[in-house]
Structures are given as C-alpha cells and as structure tokens.
Amino acid sequence: MSTNQETRGFQSEVKQLLQLMIHSLYSNKEIFLRELISNASDAADKLRFKALSVPELYEGDGDLKVRIRFDEEKGTLTISDNGIGMTRDEVIDHLGTIAKSGTKEFLSALGQDQAKDSQLIGQFGVGFYSAFIVADKVTVKTRAAGVSADKAVLWESAGEGEYSVADIDKKERGTEITLHLREDEKAFLNDWRLREIIGKYSDHIGLPVEILAKEYDDEGKETGIKWEKINKAQALWTRAKNEISEEEYQEFYKHLSHDFTDPLLWAHNKVEGNQEYTSLLYVPAKAPWDLFNREHKHGLKLYVQRVFIMDDAQVFMPNYLRFMRGLLDSNDLPLNVSREILQDNKVTSALRKALTKRALQMLEKLAKDDAEKYQRFWQEFGLVLKEGPAEDFANKETIAKLLRFASTHNDSSQQSVSLEDYVARMKEGQKAIYYITADTYVAAKNSPHLELFNKKGIEVLLLSDRIDEWMLSYLTEFDGKPLQTISKADLDLGDLADKEEDSQKAQDEQYASFVERVKTLLGERVKEVRLTHRLTDTPAVVSTGDDQMTTQMAKLFAAAGQAMPEVKYTFELNPEHGLVQKVAEIADEQQFADWIELLLEQAMLAERGSLENPVAFIKRMNTLLSKLTSH
C-alpha cells in the first residue's frame, strides 16, 4: 500500500542523458548489471562506515550482500542489497537529478559519433540510469538504515519525462531495483547468462553476490531453490598479485571509476614496516571530460583496515596527479578519520609522499619501457603534469624528466621531445636549453627569433600551451643547464655567437644616425632601438629585456583578469636586410615614418599575434603599396 504519491519531472539533463545513453551504449548493454552491483557495493560500504559510530544501523543484520533474482513469466530482473538505503529526499536527489557541475557542458559535447559518445558517457558515469538500456520500466523500493518500516520509498519510471515517488512499508533495510525488461532483452532472464556477466564484471568486489538458483537432487530432479554465492567476495586488493589476472585488474578499475575504458597501466603495492598500507593505483587511458573543472572530483578511495571511509580522498595525491585513480587501504589511520583530520596528519603526509613517489615511478617506467604508450598518456594528461614543477619542489627533477615538448628537431607539432633528449643533442659549447613560447605551434615554429638558431643548427623547444610560460618560471634549469628563452633582447649565445665582431662594429657605426632617427620618431613607445645580428630573413623584431615580463606571461595574466603594466619592447632592426637598408636612405620624413611604423607593426604582429589598431596598419600598408605600384 503506497501513500503520499506524487509525479515529478526529470531534470532536463537526465532526460537528455537517458536518450543519448540508450542510443550510445546499446552495443555494450550488459554493463547495466555491473553498474547496479557496483552501486549496491557502495551502499554496503557506506553502511559499514556509518555503523562504526552507530552500530544500531545494522538492525541485527550485519551480513551484507547483493542478491539477484529473475522472473521469466513477469519479465523482471531484481537486484537487491541490504546496504545504507535511501530516504525520500535522497531518492529524489539521486534518481531525479544529476548533481554534477558542468553537466550541461558535458551533454553539449555529445554529438552524432556513437563510439565517441559511448566513451564520454562512460567517463561521466551513468550508474543507476544504465538500467534503462535494457528496461522500459524501473521500480525501486528502498528504506534507509535507522528509519522505521513505514518510511520506505517507492520510485517508478519508464525513463521518459517523469517519475513517481510514494511512501510504502518495507521491512528489510536497503534497496531493491526491479527492471521490467524490454521484449528483446529477455535473454538476460537466464541463470547462466547472469552468472557469466557477474563473473566477468563483479568477481572482484568484496561483497557476496548471490543468485536465486534451483536445487537438484542426485537424479537431476528439481527439489527447490536457494541463494548461491557466485563471486569470490574477497576485496581484490587484499589478494596476492600473482593470483589476480589482467582482466580482473581492468574490471576492478571500471568498478572504481565507472569508466568504460580499460586503464593505461596500474600498480598494486603492499607496504609493511613503519607504515602498513596497500595501494592500487591506475592511470586512465582517457582524460575525463571535466579534468580542468575546478569542482572535478578526484582522489583515491580510502579504506582503513578494509573498512570503506570515503570516496575522492584528495589529500593523498597532489593536484598535478589528479588524473590518478585507485584506492588506499591503510592500517595506520583511525577508523573515525574525517576529511578535516586528514588535512593535518603526519600519517597522511607520509602516505601522500609515498603514493606521489609511486605514481611518478609508474610514469617513469612507462616512459622508459614504452615510448608510444607514454605518448598516448602525454596527449591526454601532459597539460596537467606541467603543473607539477610549480606544485612539487621535492619531485621537480623527476617531473622535469617526464615532460615532453615540440622542438625544431622534429617537423611535427607532437610533443615528444624530453629534456634529456635535448641535452643529449646539445652543440659543443652550448650552455643553455633554448625555447620559444607562442600562442600556437605554427607561430612558434615560424618566429623570426628562430632564424639564427636555424642557421646554426641549434635545437629550440617550441612551446605553445598556455601553461608553459608559467611552468618555466618554476622550472629554470635541468641537468645543471639553464632554460633560456630566445625572445629576450640581450640573448647571450656564449661560445656559439658569431665571431664577426669587426664587421658588426662597422655596421653599428654606419647605421648609428639611422638608429637615432628611429629612436626620435618612436620616443617612449619602445624601450630601446638597436641593430640586431641574429636575423637572416626578417627585417625587424621586438624583444623584451631580462628584467621584463615576456609577451606570453603578460597574456597569461591578462587572461586571468589581472591588470599588468604595459610591456615596452626593444625594437631590433636587421642591417643586412634590403628593406632596412632602403628605409635608412629615405630623406622624406613622412615616408620614413610610414615605413618605420610598418616595420614596427609587422614585428609586433609576429610577436603578439595581434595589433592594437589593425585598421591603421592595413591603411598604412595599402598606402605604401599604392605608392610602390604607381612608379
């Protein structure tokens, strides 16, 4: 008998997700059972945790389990647990809405590519809603631990626009989900089919999964039915590594993360001594859709003495390793540990240090043993790893070895060059690791600042990620060699510099009056005007001084909404270039001014990628071109 019934509309994002999910995940539909068993396992974990402080929540029934039964006549499959259960408000919150930040953005990323959509939805984690892949109606009966039998809740929906919720009586604690299977999904109402799926997806969870099975006598006659445990029901991380198959590790990752894709790699460690803990760390194959969302949930699943404590314990991994998934089972933390206690705890600090080191070792080994696989990792998570040098001084050298960059050594935008690779190829007499930053790879590759380096065959790292300039303010050297930008006005090439000092000195004297004339014209708009001998094909460049912020750093601050002082550039002119030589001979002041302005604007455009007044630049260009073509 149900009371207080109401019909409610799904949150719009739920409706959209249900439609997309049924379409995109149809080819992998058996995962619905994994998701529902995984939820039941989580419900048991949460009850165990709450019962640490309130044992009465067990209600005399501490034997936690998941039970599965089916009814061929009715076409139903039922998954039940005796875990924490839900109240009416929790049912509405969990089954009627998606309480994830960035959900709208995620849904807008889904399109017509079914394979890509399937992967994205898998990363998002559909959980309970996966039931609608195979069912045209879902019924949920649930009672929260510690509340009376008449405070249970009935939830029903056909997975379209709305659902109903009502109060019912339910003696047993926990949640019972009944799937009314579609006509073409009745193959799931089969004992051996269910055993196969559960063995494949849920053998690793620490909770018994039981199926209602028929009993037979010695002559093969049916004598009744009984509940039969069909999984190992031993937490995977407590087992010996040599007993665990690759497939079991992969399925456990999917249970932990609700990701549908196999992980890239994992490491399972049991540590004894000053600290006693077991860790199982995974590197996903794909970056989650919300990796750069500030509210992105990350961290390890925390157990203390095999008792679940919390999801997403962020304190055990630094932020630059937030892509790592897995669990930690510690013997040294108290069972009543809270997020607040974790923040300021010596044991936590020691565990974080050890787990960070282990995660970095995993990546070091991957980079050494399988460059192609490491490149796949870098394409997904390289941007996050670049946050490391600023966050983790103690491991800065290790992180630096893991970084990858594009370079003039390769004719490719792929970031595949390590700092160790670069150092091994350095020219004799080269003292620094040279780099250039720009908005894009193409802009970096074609920067006029590269001309002298290309001429001399000196490798330069080409950096175009927004984070690069910020990262390099923390990563200033590697292997005892400074990292040096080539866009500075006072670039010192040391032993690699040209030895033609006499001819350069003569040019400086020859063009001294020209340089003064340009200085007078531009005045305070530039920091300095000088000749340069590091260009081959370009008439002029602008550069910043050693005491100034670089162009890319200024852009970074501006993008963050911070007011920054104007960058005053040094204007460098190439006396070997025919255009500069011609302009130096112009006597008419207006014509001279127009050409100098054009050269400055060109240099600014090459450096910054934009101009404050592009219309004036175009007009000036057209005027000068018209004069040239009229002769």
From Swiss-Prot:
Q: Where is this region: B?
A: 340-555
Q: What is this protein's function?
A: Molecular chaperone. Has ATPase activity.
Question: Where is this gene product found?
Answer: Cytoplasm
Q: Which gene encodes it?
A: htpG
Going by the entry's taxonomy, the superkingdom of the source organism is recorded as: Bacteria
Assembly and oligomerization: Homodimer.
One MF annotation (Gene Ontology) recorded for this entry: ATP binding
Is the keyword ATP-binding assigned to this protein?
Answer: yes
Q: Where is this region: A?
A: 1-339
- What are the entry keywords? ATP-binding, Chaperone, Cytoplasm, Nucleotide-binding, Stress response
Give the family this protein belongs to, as stated in its UniProt record.
Belongs to the heat shock protein 90 family.
Q: Which NCBIfam families match?
A: PRK05218.1
Species of origin: Pasteurella multocida (strain Pm70)
The name of this protein is Chaperone protein HtpG
- According to its UniProt record, what is one Pfam family this protein matches? HATPase_c_3
Record region (C): 556-631
HAMAP family reported for this sequence: HSP90
Q: Name one GO cellular component term.
A: cytoplasm
